[in-house]
Design a protein with these regions (language model features):
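Alpha-helical and His/Cys-centered functional microenvironments
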Residues: 6, 14, 33, 153
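PLP-dependent amino-acid enzyme catalytic core
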Residues: 28, 39-527
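Intrinsic disorder/low-complexity segments
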Residues: 6, 18-21
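Short, positively charged and aromatic/hydrophobic N-terminal segments
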Residues: 13, 21, 25-33, 39
Length: 527
């Protein structure tokens, strides 16, 4: 059973409740709806690996990851959600509707959403949809750090603070592994937020110079940034190991949580821009309500594309979801064959946010496609951890391929797309977007439905790759290349990136992955 839904007239059944407070809260919601005569839904999340490990949405957001190492999940397809009604609303109201449905026990979601985004984005629409040739590009990078992560990480700090208050928790320590964009977006969202501390780990030499500069110059009294000798998978595995090692440990009243998309509070806000893009196409007269739209998503940790699948299960008429990968093509092989195998070379590419071999959010998809078979998911995850690979059943592969397409693109292919889009459409994109555009061309979705390519970062976050694609070569530092790219194309350098030059480096720590637990404990315990 994917999630527990409580409606008027139904008997209360809540497995695995561990606290009286949680039980009373469940009873309260049921009794209140009977007294008011209104029909409502109260949702409980549980681990992808054990449905007995349950949590209210606030607790799921606060903990970030389930006690057994699984991810908190419910089936959004079980929600009673008015998806057509929300299409008529402005972006802020739409976000409040969607987050209120996925995280129903948060108080005043409308106020929380509006406070989270106030003054942070270039426009109130947050994520403009731009026609480019015969396709559309959904620009997700107009927030404070010029990356799509801003959409979710503007909201997550307020969700965590609200959850801590409602749950009566102490200080929250946010642990985050980043392949580039999540780190700065999380730091920007959490810096100097009362009752929180944040620690960001990134692979040394595994992010772009601009991404690194964004992180190591971060100000704030509650922030720590540390490089790991290894790749992103090492950093992400290290964070998960810290969670496991700290289970049941006295942390002086602190609670560990995550800003990665393993946290449902990070994933849920990403669902919103799929609805926003669809609504924009309806308002532009490109489609009528009920007609399908295809989405092509540059994919690493599988959170962004999973948000699109959540939107589909909530009722949005999503057609195909195309998973675009770079040379680290583990997901392309998985969707094509049903075999997930991380035992392969790791490539550092011009699209570093996709340089991942272990896609954590795929676990939630496996849960949904297996119809909530926690034992099956737990077995696959154990095999992946033990042997480095697994193969799904023919039935699950059939379900996977009924929803997803895939394609991959190497650095040379991405550079060719960047050059061609500029020459033919006068549109400038970053390497991640170029990978997705290439995937859209390879899959050839030719049924007449609109194709939306998600653009996840400003081209100015990767000036060397973009300038190299346009001119065939480049030299100088990143900031000189930004200026050169500006002069060449006439496009504007985002102020948050231009302002990095000359800022003081505040974080210089570099450690081995085996040192992460001691590093975290020293910070948390104050030693």
């Amino acid at each position: 059973m994917q999630c527990r839904l409580f409606r008027s007239g139904q008997r209360i059944y809540v497995p695995g409740i561990k606290t009286l407070a949680f039980l009373l809260e469940t009873v309260y919601h049921t009794v209140s709806e009977k007294a008011s005569g209104k029909r409502s839904v109260f949702m409980i999340y549980h681990s992808t690996r054990d449905e007995k490990l349950t949590a209210a949405p606030t607790r799921a957001v606060l903990e970030g990851i389930a006690p057994d190492g699984g991810l908190y999940v419910c089936d959004p397809g079980k929600l009673d959600f008015d998806w057509q009604g929300t299409l008529q609303k402005d972006t802020m109201s739409m976000a409040a509707d969607i987050l209120g449905a996925l995280l129903p026990d948060f108080q005043d979601m409308n106020g929380l959403v509006r406070a989270s985004y106030a003054g942070k984005f270039a426009s109130d629409d947050l994520t403009p949809l731009v026609p480019v040739g015969e396709r559309y590009v959904l620009e997700l990078y107009h927030g404070p750090t010029s990356a799509f992560k801003d959409v979710a990480l503007s909201v997550l700090p307020r969700l965590v603070s609200a959850a801590a208050k409602q749950e009566g928790a102490g200080d929250v320590v946010i642990l985050t592994a980043t392949s580039g964009d999540t780190g700065k977006a999380a730091l920007e969202g959490f810096h100097d937020v009362s009752g929180t501390r944040i620690m960001v780990f990134y692979p040394a030499g595994g992010v772009s110079p601009v991404q690194e500069a964004q992180m190591v110059t971060q100000e704030g009294g509650n922030v720590r940034v540390c490089a790991i000798r290894g790749n992103f998978d090492d950093a992400q595995t290290g964070v998960k190991n810290v969670f496991a090692a700290c289970k049941g440990k006295d942390l002086h009243g602190a609670v560990l949580s995550s800003a990665n998309s393993i946290n449902i509070g990070r994933l849920a806000p990403q669902v919103v821009y799929y609805f926003r893009a669809y609504a924009d196409l309806v308002q532009a007269g490109r489609i009528r309500v009920g007609e399908k739209v295809h989405f092509v998503v540059p994919t690493g940790n599988f959170g962004d594309i999973l948000a699109g699948y959540f939107a589909k299960r909530m009722g949005l008429p999503v057609g195909r979801l195309v998973c675009a990968s770079n040379a680290n093509d583990v997901l392309t092989e998985f969707i094509s064959t049903g075999v997930y195998d991380r035992r392969r070379p790791f490539y550092k590419t011009t699209s570093p946010s996709m340089d991942i071999l272990v896609s954590s959010n795929l676990e939630r998809l496996l849960y949904l496609l297996s119809e909530g078979d926690c034992g099956y998911v737990a077995g696959l995850m154990e095999q992946l951890n033990r042997e480095g690979h697994y193969q799904v059943s023919p039935r699950l592969l059939e379900r996977l391929q009924a929803e997803f397409d895939c394609a991959c693109c190497d650095d040379a292919g991405a550079a060719e797309v960047i050059r061609r889009l500029w020459q033919e459409q006068h549109y400038l994109c970053d390497p991640h977007t170029a990978v997705a555009w290439s995937a859209a061309e390879q899959v050839r979705l030719e049924d007449g439905a609109p194709v939306v390519v998600l653009s996840t970062a400003s081209p100015y976050k990767f000036p060397a790759a973009v300038l190299g694609a346009l001119e065939g070569g480049c030299d100088g530092d990143e900031f000189a290349m930004m200026e050169r790219l500006h002069r060449l194309t006439g496009t504007e350098v985002p102020r948050n990136l231009a302002g990095l030059q000359g800022r003081t480096v505040r974080h210089r720590d570099v450690i081995d992955k085996e040192q992460m637990l001691d590093y975290v404990l020293a910070e948390v315990m104050g030693s």
